[in-house]
Amino acid sequence: HRELILPQLSGPGVAAHLVKKLSGFKVTYGPIRARDLLVFLDTGLKATPEMRFKTFTTWERTELIPMELVGALKPGILVIAVFFLVAFLGRSEEGWTNALSHGLFSALAMLTAILVGAVLAPLLLPWLPGRAFSVKGFSVGVLFAAILAACYWYGWITSADGLEILAWLLLVPAVSAYLGMNFTGASTYTSLSGVKKEMRWALPLEIAGGIIG
């Protein structure tokens, strides 16, 4: 045979006419999902509308979360270690218990920012405001930053001062916005040009929020 069956979603990265010219193989785009391939072959390479339609359900997004979470936790652990070091260096004169308390608070706040951006943003994706994924991540980050501020306001957080809370009001949305934007690579309906356009304005704001915080 001189026919090459490729997944439908490989289309944007394949120049079918060049494949034919250079190898002699005709490119046929098969179904989106591998599980439909046998039926596609049995029906004479005819795809049903269902084979051409890609869903992005809550469960399908949930399956992608472990990959996103592991990628976010690797640098996150290093940042948490730095926060502990800064807490011990800056608060050691106030006692090791106080230094440990500040370090733990910073670690929990950073983990919250990561979980918000890498877990909640993908799960709540269709219901979060905005079209840009960074805006979606930012919105859920702002919500949790507001909860953090409320906990401090009502005296439920005693291991951080007002300046630290202010810093986290900037850091949590910045981190969650970045991780939300990062999820565009796993989505089914974002375009390369759209992602590049979003990154041009979102990334500087996320970096600024992280640095100021």
Which sequence ranges carry the predicted segments?
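Hydrophobic alpha-helical scaffolding
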Residues: L9, V27, M110-I114, I165, ...
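Generic secondary-structure signature for well-ordered alpha-helical cores
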Residues: G24, D42-K46, E50, P129, ...
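Generic detector of multi-pass transmembrane helix bundles and their immediately adjacent loops
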Residues: P122, P126, S134-G213
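Cytosolic juxtamembrane regions of integral membrane proteins
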Residues: I32-K74
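Soluble N-terminal domains of membrane-associated systems
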Residues: H1-I32
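Hydrophobic alpha-helical transmembrane segments
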Residues: V14, L22-V27, M51-F53, A87, ...
